Amino acid sequence: MDYKEQSHIIPTYKRFDIVLEKGQGVYLFDDKAKKYLDFSSGIGVCALGYNHAKFNAKIKAQVDKLLHTSNLYYNENIAAAAKNLAKASALERVFFTNSGTESIEGAMKTARKYAFNKGVKGGQFIAFKHSFHGRTLGALSLTANEKYQKPFKPLISGVKFAKYNDISSVEKLVNEKTCAIILESVQGEGGINPANKDFYKALRKLCDEKDILLIADEIQCGMGRSGKFFAYEHAQILPDIMTSAKALGCGLSVGAFVINQKVASNSLEAGDHGSTYGGNPLVCAGVNAVFEIFKEEKILENVNKLTPYLEQSLDELINEFDFCKKRKGLGFMQGLSLDKSVKVAKVIQKCQENALLLISCGENDLRFLPPLILQKEHIDEMSEKLRKALKSF
């Protein structure tokens, strides 16, 4: 079979000329048995790397037991998964979805219902420039990218975009219909921009004063990637709503939005929202395995231990190559800005030739999202392969 045959697939992706067949640890292998060091982890999904023995065993055991029922019945896995996620997030109530964009949609509905119950119809949102929250119509409305939005307008009305890390720009946009402020705790596609602590605290204060909900999008930066379970913890604040996906299932299609009790008591009720597949026994077995393995293998400790070395390795490249301009990020979510004279797509292609997988973000940035099981020798290997690629320019 020709794996590159695309005649029956809607052409929404520009794929690299690589056919991936299997993975092991932090490595992927193509159909020609070429071994790649993966520093993209399926766009931040595969936190435990590939072919993790315990994770696979838990999933296989559940496959033999029960794949799916529906949310008309109880299942033990969803209860445990919700407890794990509520504890990790320091929030109270969980709704499981199938993806990140669905989690955003659910968060938006929750915020609208909360505002509606206060007498505010058509609640409005404040999001941020350079944001990315998803591609379904609601999430797309919060995504500040005209290229993505233009063919699908009109989108949800009343969305305003503030300047990230600038509280005064947010304050100017708040009105009596504002129901929520949403931000990525670390902007991903927009260029790996972390929210600074003072900004996050000021947002929390503003939301408390105005009874506006604060939504933290942790889909890419959450689940340990920042060195804490969720990146908002670095600012020592709690959002009212948090969205999760990607590494929550480490390859299984699962997302969630999590809310505090105040919001839970004043928003969604039976019949307000639903999902056929959301929280089924299989994906929740995977979620529970992820939390169990994170604890057993001290995944957060590993990220915190190795982050300084990863940052140092990238900083050395900035010192060595004039066109490497700036490093940004938090934990195992890092970006390296390149001068416009060197196209990031060409650097990524050279890296692939050197058996290193990276992806882009921002205007012209390399994005580093390695599996959280990364070891020091893998950082050294990445530096060697990337340095070799950069010497071509």
Curated annotation (Swiss-Prot):
The record's EC number reads 2.6.1.11
Annotated pathway, please?
A: Amino-acid biosynthesis; L-arginine biosynthesis; N(2)-acetyl-L-ornithine from L-glutamate: step 4/4
Q: Which InterPro entries match?
A: AcOrn/SuccOrn_fam (IPR004636), Aminotrans_3 (IPR005814), Aminotrans_3_PPA_site (IPR049704), Class-III_PLP-dep_AT (IPR050103), PyrdxlP-dep_Trfase (IPR015424), PyrdxlP-dep_Trfase_major (IPR015421), PyrdxlP-dep_Trfase_small (IPR015422)
The EC category is transferase
Has the keyword NAD been applied to this entry? no
* Keyword vocabulary terms for this entry: Amino-acid biosynthesis, Aminotransferase, Arginine biosynthesis, Cytoplasm, Pyridoxal phosphate, Transferase
Q: How is the cofactor bound?
A: Binds 1 pyridoxal phosphate per subunit.
Q: Which residues bind N(2)-acetyl-L-ornithine?
A: 135, 275
Alphabetical GO biological process terms: L-arginine biosynthetic process
Q: Which cofactor does it need?
A: pyridoxal 5'-phosphate
Annotated HAMAP family? ArgD_aminotrans_3
Assembly state and interactors?
Homodimer.
Extra remark: May also have succinyldiaminopimelate aminotransferase activity, thus carrying out the corresponding step in lysine biosynthesis.
Name of the protein described by the UniProt record: Acetylornithine aminotransferase
Q: Which organism is it from?
A: Campylobacter jejuni subsp. jejuni serotype O:2 (strain ATCC 700819 / NCTC 11168)
What's the encoding gene here? argD
